[in-house]
Design a protein with these regions (language model features):
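Tryptophan-anchored aromatic micro-motifs
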Residues: 29-53, 79, 139-143, 166-168
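Predominantly extracellular/secreted and cell-surface proteins with exposed
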Residues: 56-126
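Edge beta-strand at a domain terminus
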Residues: 140-170
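Residues that flank catalytic or metal-binding motifs in active/ligand-binding sites
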Residues: 34, 61, 160-162
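Flexible, membrane-facing loop/turn or short amphipathic-helix motifs
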Residues: 45-54, 106-113, 147-157
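Internal, hydrophobic beta-strand segments that form the core of beta-sheet-rich folds
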Residues: 116-150
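Secretory targeting and sorting signals
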Residues: 1-27
Length: 170
């Protein structure tokens, strides 16, 4: 039997043995996701509006997060906030993203409003925020909300960015 045929036979036998034993690939690993209840804090003291410091009210809410992961750092799920919104959550390369629309976010001089899109981007860090730590229950990043260019008759988008922190509480 040629050498490559013997190797192919060994690989095929191993595959059949796995199939016969009922072994299956695990698509979700609970340690890869972020599941549970978290305190979400957006620090308005360090907010920027269109790249200039512009103090905003800080916001604190409670999130319930449910995720499933196909690979480490590749996850999807849902976030439910006690501020009465639910949005998808996903991660790419250990960075998490949550995006949700906000109705009537930009007030216009004529009394009308325009919507905004709020995006949270964060990753697991040491509690002091100095180093990445995938096993940490403290996640830090940014909370960015953008209003559409052209809203209120102005051709410049409204952009507010502030530091963000997510801490597991349950």
């Amino acid at each position: 039997m040629p050498r490559w045929s013997a190797a192919a036979a060994v690989v095929a036998a191993a595959a059949l043995a796995d199939a016969a034993s009922g072994a299956t690939a695990q698509a979700d690993h609970p340690d890869w996701g972020i599941n549970g209840t978290y305190t979400a804090t957006s620090n308005g003291e360090w907010a920027r509006k269109n790249d200039f410091f512009y103090e905003q009210a800080s916001r604190r809410s409670t999130w319930t997060v449910n995720t499933m992961c196909s690979y480490p750092g590749e996850c999807t799920g849902t976030v439910s906030s006690d501020e009465n919104w639910t949005a998808p959550i996903y991660s790419r390369s250990w960075i998490w993203y949550v995006k949700h629309p906000i109705d009537n976010w930009v007030p216009c001089p004529d009394g009308s409003t325009a919507p905004g899109l709020q995006t949270f981007r964060f990753k697991a860090m040491t509690p002091d925020g100095a180093n990445a730590d995938p096993s940490s229950t403290t996640l830090v990043g940014e909370d960015t909300t953008i209003g559409p260019s052209g809203a209120c008759g102005a051709s410049k988008a409204v952009y507010i960015n502030m530091p963000f922190k997510l801490v597991k509480i349950g």
